[in-house]
Amino acid sequence: MSRYRGPRFKKIRRLGALPGLTSKRPRAGSDLRNQSRPGKKSQYRIRLEEKQKLRFHYGLTERQLLKYVRIARKAKGSTGQVLLQLLEMRLDNILFRLGMASTIPQARQLVNHRHILVNGRTVDIPSYRCKPRDIISARDEQKSRTLIQNYLDSSTNEELPKHLTFHTLQYKGLVNQIIDRKWVGLKINELLVVEYYSRQT
């Protein structure tokens, strides 16, 4: 299944706020209208919607998300929390959380078009897994810096998560540590996502 490129508002109206996909928010009351439909949601539907929320927020294909779930299952610790850490430490998401892009799709474009350096080297893979002490910066070119400055100017000035530091004048961010669960930028029940995939295999 390919990455979603359809109407974004349609998704947030059904699933709730997806800041990685779009800065738009569902209108007040739209969630209530969805909940007022006759019939109770099945457990499968609830798990499916949490999975879709995760997939659309981080801009993943179904295959990519399944791959991350499998990696998380093999790691030590809570599968759900490890899954969120893997997704949050992707380069495209780090750029988004730093404010260097307004959405994750915009961050992905910056990476694909070779505007971003990691530790002084160009990285053009959005899924690149960042690690503590990585330095994320814009290429020292006018075009790269202008693009990022435009995103910074339009950002909503949300509080920077504790695992990141950003130096605005240098267009440079630092990964301080692996993200803590409470700083994940999406309202999600990751256990339902893990349960969804457990029942599919």
Swiss-Prot record:
Residues 14-43 are annotated as: Disordered. One of its GO terms (cellular component) is chloroplast. Keywords: Chloroplast, Plastid, Ribonucleoprotein, Ribosomal protein, RNA-binding, rRNA-binding. Residues 89-169 form the S4 RNA-binding domain. GO terms for molecular function: rRNA binding; structural constituent of ribosome. Pfam families: Ribosomal_S4, S4. GO terms for biological process: ribosomal small subunit biogenesis; translation. It comes from the Eukaryota. Coiled coil: none annotated. InterPro entries: Ribosomal_uS4, Ribosomal_uS4_bac-type, Ribosomal_uS4_CS, Ribosomal_uS4_N, S4_RNA-bd, S4_RNA-bd_sf. One of the primary rRNA binding proteins, it binds directly to 16S rRNA where it nucleates assembly of the body of the 30S subunit. With S5 and S12 plays an important role in translational accuracy. HAMAP family: Ribosomal_uS4_B (MF_01306_B). This is Small ribosomal subunit protein uS4c. It comes from Gossypium hirsutum (Upland cotton). The lineage of its organism: Eukaryota, Viridiplantae, Streptophyta, Embryophyta, Tracheophyta. The gene is rps4.
